[in-house]
Design a protein with these regions (language model features):
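Aspartic protease catalytic domain
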Residues: 20-35, 314-440
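Extended serine/threonine-enriched, polar tracts that run as long, contiguous segments within proteins
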Residues: 253-272, 279-282, 290-294, 310-312
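Non-catalytic N-lobe/flap surface of aspartyl protease domains
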Residues: 23-225, 282-308, 352-353
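Short, surface-exposed linear segments at secondary-structure transitions and domain or protein termini
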Residues: 140-150, 216, 227-235, 328-343, ...
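A short acidic Gly-Thr/Ser loop motif
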Residues: 74, 81-87, 265-271, 278, ...
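Flexible, small-/acidic-enriched active-site or ligand-binding loops
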Residues: 201-261, 335-337
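A short acidic-Thr-Gly-centered motif at the start of a beta-strand
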Residues: 62-76, 238-261, 347-354
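Cleavable N-terminal signal peptides of Sec/SRP-targeted secreted and luminal proteins
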Residues: 4-24
């Protein structure tokens, strides 16, 4: 339980492994700051000297695949995926202090992977916030899940645990946290940091009920309501997409979506973005020299590593530019006995598991370009789940500057990697003239 009415918990984003390029955000603390200062380094730091708040949770970024927050569950610290795309809490692999355990078994299925176990109750601590008797899934079996667990940051109506046992403690942790701290405004704000390819760099923050000071102007930005209005997820209406200044046609398969819009899930638990095929082709077809690979169930693009497109999205007001570094992922492959570097598309055609409740799944490669505020509305009430819920964005990408800096940043990072492959040798099935194969 927080001792201050506007308590927050912050996450230091630590990059591990091969990451994307850019400068790390430095959140500078002052006497009124809820943030903390951090620099590039190779190990997480919990240095909160002279900060004005008592809650600090470290976060790591595993090869830009997922953002992990250190959360204490039942007396043990776990590195949990911060996931706005789901609502349940689960952990695995350790003996923890459990208040009580049920005989209710549950299997949670995600776009990739699953986790199963029994529902139990324990104390959960997020920074200085402590939620007593929180229901969670005590997992004993996982499939394609690399982290210690997932911290779902979505609505009650999406919680599989709450549907299973129908108790107040079974609601998602954010709903219980806001109810136990009624003076705290019920929103969370999230900044995901981009890091350089070959460095481990900290940066970024998540706060509850307050904004990081240098992003406080987000309070005056438009609030985009959930769309459709019956949505149980963090989905909003995408009203515009442009590539090099040209509009991309938007259509929706979602019932209730307005004509000319597409329903977009803003999902911190997904690394890339999964969007309609025509939108993918519009992005990479605009980059000269790109090759569309369609073979053996794969559907992606190989892109010149120094090629770029001007991509931006609008949700009803100004267009939000996407840093061109986000459009591709650096990869290596072996042709003969030699390793080479290629760049593959980061915006991918929709997964079959995306479902009919969204058209665009915008993950971390979108969220790193904005400061995102998730307003829960009345979502702490079972009687009025997500009425009034909305999302706000403040752009973090200066359009002119990011395009100007792209060549320099990408060139610098390529210096530490194997040589670029000659893309003229790659066929549309992903094979090369010399017998190698590039996979997504």
């Amino acid at each position: 339980m927080s001792s201050t009415p506007f308590a927050t918990f912050a996450f230091a984003l630590i990059a591990c492994g091969k990451l994307l390029e850019s400068n790390a955000l430095a959140i500078i603390r002052d006497d009124h700051s809820i943030g903390f200062y951090f620099n590039a380094h190779y190990k997480p730091t919990n240095d909160a000297t002279n900060t004005t708040f008592g809650s600090l949770v470290s976060v790591t970024s595993e090869s830009d695949l997922e953002y992990l927050g250190q959360v204490n569950v039942g007396g043990h610290d776990f590195n949990l995926v911060l996931d706005t795309g789901s609502s349940d809490l689960w952990v695995t692999g350790q003996q923890i202090k459990i208040n009580s355990e049920t005989s209710d078994n549950l299997n949670l299925t995600y776009g990739i992977g699953s986790a199963s176990g029994n529902i139990a109750y324990t104390t959960v601590q997020l920074g200085t916030y402590q939620v007593q008797n929180q229901a969670f899934l005590n997992v004993d079996k996982t499939y394609q899940q690399g982290a210690d667990g997932i911290l779902g940051l979505g609505f009650i109506s999406l919680s599989m645990i709450e549907k299973k046992i129908k108790t107040k403690a079974a609601r998602p942790i954010m709903a219980n946290l806001f109810e136990q701290n009624p003076t705290t405004p019920n929103f969370m704000a999230l900044a995901l940091e981009r890091t350089t390819d070959n460095e481990n760099t900290s940066g970024g923050a998540i706060t509850i009920g307050e904004y990081v000071p240098q992003f406080k102007d987000v309070s005056g930005t438009p609030k985009y309501p959930l769309a459709p209005s019956t949505s149980s997820r963090w989905t909003i209406a995408l009203s515009g997409m442009q590539v090099n200044g040209h509009d991309v046609t938007l259509k929706s398969v979602v019932k209730g979506a307005k004509k000319g819009t597409a329903i977009s899930l803003i999902d911190s638990g997904t690394s890339l973005a999964y969007i309609p095929s025509n939108a993918v082709d519009a992005i990479y077809g605009a980059i000269s020299g790109s090759i569309h690979i369609q073979s053996n169930g794969q559907n992606f693009w190989i892109v010149p590593c120094l090629g770029q497109a001007n991509l931006s999205f609008s949700f009803g007001h100004d267009y939000l530019p996407i840093n061109p570094l986000e459009l591709t992922r650096l990869a290596t492959f072996t042709d003969g006995n030699t390793q080479y570097t290629v760049c593959t598309s980061a915006f991918r055609p929709q997964l079959s598991s995306t479902g009919s409740d969204m058209d665009f799944l915008l993950g971390d490669i979108f969220m790193r370009n904005v400061y995102s505020v998730f307003n829960f509305g009345n979502s702490t009430s079972n009687n009025d789940d997500d009425k009034g819920a909305s999302i706000q964005f403040l752009s973090r990408s200066n359009k002119d500057q990011v395009y100007q800096d792209f060549q320099q940043q990408r060139t610098q990072n390529l210096k530490n990697l194997p040589p670029l492959y000659d893309l003229s040798k790659i066929h549309s099935d992903g094979t090369s003239s010399d017998g190698g194969r590039v996979n997504s």
